[in-house]
Curated annotation (Swiss-Prot):
Catalytic activity from the UniProt record: a lipid A disaccharide + ATP = a lipid IVA + ADP + H(+)
Listed GO biological process terms: lipid A biosynthetic process; lipopolysaccharide core region biosynthetic process
Alphabetized Pfam families for the sequence: LpxK
Similarity field: Belongs to the LpxK family.
Keyword match Nucleotide-binding: yes
InterPro entries given in the database record: LpxK (IPR003758), P-loop_NTPase (IPR027417)
Gene name as annotated: lpxK
Organism of origin: Bartonella tribocorum (strain CIP 105476 / IBS 506)
Pathway recorded for this protein: Glycolipid biosynthesis; lipid IV(A) biosynthesis; lipid IV(A) from (3R)-3-hydroxytetradecanoyl-[acyl-carrier-protein] and UDP-N-acetyl-alpha-D-glucosamine: step 6/6
HAMAP family tied to this protein: LpxK (MF_00409)
UniProt keyword annotation of ATP-binding present: yes
Top enzyme class: transferase
Keywords: ATP-binding, Kinase, Lipid A biosynthesis, Lipid biosynthesis, Lipid metabolism, Nucleotide-binding, Transferase
Protein name: Tetraacyldisaccharide 4'-kinase
Residues that hold ATP according to the record: T53, C54, G55, G56, T57, G58, K59, T60
Length: 346
């Protein structure tokens, strides 16, 4: 679920939260029932990297980090993605040379730079397609709440700045499913960043008795940033985090423009942004996800002063990805053995 998160989601007291509470209760009831269903099983190890809430948490760079380590360990990882924002139907294997963000979504194109990616609303069918391509490890990008594919391990990502928001379920708050239900199905949590909300998240996770891991996002840019003044624009789930990353690289953010998550920029949008930047002698700045969507428009020569920002994940526990992948494989082998034993007895 990718939408522009309203501000009241991140405030503890709000009239809108109270007003939307009855709808939230109904949504929460049915979402809990969805999570209780039995998902189809594939004979490959499956690691789900998801989140508790609607909106951006830094999940995509985490999936990329796991794909990189998986390849280092000798696996052929395949990523199952919903393909948010894309128009393709059925099961589609992403080809980064020929597909555009309008076809498969911006996240799928970013992920395809590091692993095989299959996009589909049917996650089981997508996993089967990846198996045919020779993949021997499935990384599921999101899909924790939908339960459309059996998961050997579930890692949920939390943005420390936002935490669980106001603690309410959609649409009164950002939670996709009531926290208690999500806690019961998850295996561990990855908390990214620093903030006051981090302490509340840590407290709630500690009460579940399940592991809490920590990481930080390290910004990088396509050109030198320090000392430059920027007009920054983004159509992502959490644009404030992007604006902060410019400052962390010693850039000066003078103007900011935000658009809905997964927004496809028009020529008119870009012309307006370029003119405003030129008027105040500013550099343009955007994210790697936004730039992939901008590339669906024919090449523009007036974007030469555009700097693209991306992020890498810096895990506090340096061998975190390796250790978690080993746990995924251990669980997969255990269920495979149990299935073989049960079949033999039958």
């Amino acid at each position: 679920m990718h939408i522009s998160a309203p501000h009241f989601w991140w405030k503890n007291k709000s009239f809108l939260r109270f007003l939307l509470a009855p709808i939230s209760w109904g949504y929460g009831y049915f979402s809990c029932r969805f999570m209780g269903r039995q998902p189809p099983v594939i004979d490959l190890p499956v690691l789900c990297i998801g989140n508790f809430t609607c909106g951006g948490t830094g999940k995509t760079p985490v999936v990329i980090a796991f794909a990189k380590v998986a390849k280092e360990l000798g696996f052929v990882p395949g990523v199952v993605s919903r393909g948010y924002g894309g128009a393709v139907k059925g099961v589609h294997l992403v080809n980064e040379k020929y597909d555009t963000a309008r076809d498969v979504g911006d996240e799928a194109l970013l992920l395809a730079q590091h692993a095989f990616v299959a996009v589909s609303a049917n996650r089981y069918a997508a996993a089967q397609r990846l198996k045919k391509e020779g993949c021997n490890l499935i990384l599921m990008d999101d899909g924790f709440q939908s339960r459309r594919l059996y998961m050997d391990y579930t890692l949920l990502v939390v943005d420390a700045m936002r935490g669980f928001g106001n603690g309410a379920v959609f649409p009164a708050g950002p939670l996709r499913v009531p926290l208690k239900t999500q806690f019961s199905f998850m295996d561990s949590v990855l908390l990214i960043g620093h903030s006051d909300a981090r302490d509340n998240v840590s407290f709630l996770i500690a009460r579940t008795g399940k592991p809490l891991h920590r990481a930080h996002l390290k910004a990088r840019a396509s050109d030198e940033v320090a000392g430059k003044s920027f007009l920054a624009f983004a159509g992502i789930g959490n644009p404030d985090k992007f604006f902060q990353s410019i400052k962390e690289l010693s850039g000066h953010v003078v103007q900011t423009y935000t658009y809905p998550d997964h927004y496809f920029f028009t020529d008119k949008n870009l012309t307006s942004l370029v003119q405003k930047a030129q008027m105040y002698n500013l550099w343009l700045a955007t994210t790697a996800k936004d730039y992939i969507r901008i590339q669906t428009i024919h090449e523009r020569k007036d974007l030469k002063n555009l700097i693209v920002f991306d992020v890498d994940v810096d895990f506090v526990q340096k061998d975190f990805c390796r250790m978690l992948l080993e746990e995924v494989i251990t669980r997969f082998r255990k269920r495979s053995c149990e299935f073989s034993c049960a079949k033999g007895k039958g």
